[in-house]
Amino acid sequence: MEKRRVGQTKLEIDSLGLGGAPLGGNFVDLGYAQAEELIQTAKNIGIGYFDTAPWYGFGRSERVMGDVLRGSEYILSDKVGRLLAPGPVKNPADFGMVDPLPFNVVYDYSYDGIMRAYEDNLQRLGLDRI
């Protein structure tokens, strides 16, 4: 797999990665087993870069990504600025989501909000690094 350097860093990532929006039910209801199979297939063909976000199914994508990636080598990107607060999603279709987890988004781009989002992301992923 061709690699590309990230900015001025020494980090190199695959030129092709797997995006996690469909894994969270964004625009299509991809069940857990299908999502797990998709991630595993990507790993098996040499993809090592994965991307997810709290927005993707309000945590659904992060949960399955963490479960499948745990214990393997990977590069994972996630997002901050949107915290998830427990509560029913009133109109998931308005967000382009099918069967999201029961959370609502709270926008917070402050330093504390970003750090909280990072910690929350790790918790949903069940991982110790992003």
Language model region names:
Residues 1-86:
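N-terminal binding-site loop/beta-alpha segment at the start of enzyme catalytic domains
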Residues 27, 94-130:
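Glycine/proline-rich, positively charged
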Residues 46, 55-62, 88-94, 116-124:
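Noncatalytic linker/hinge segments flanking ATPase motor cores
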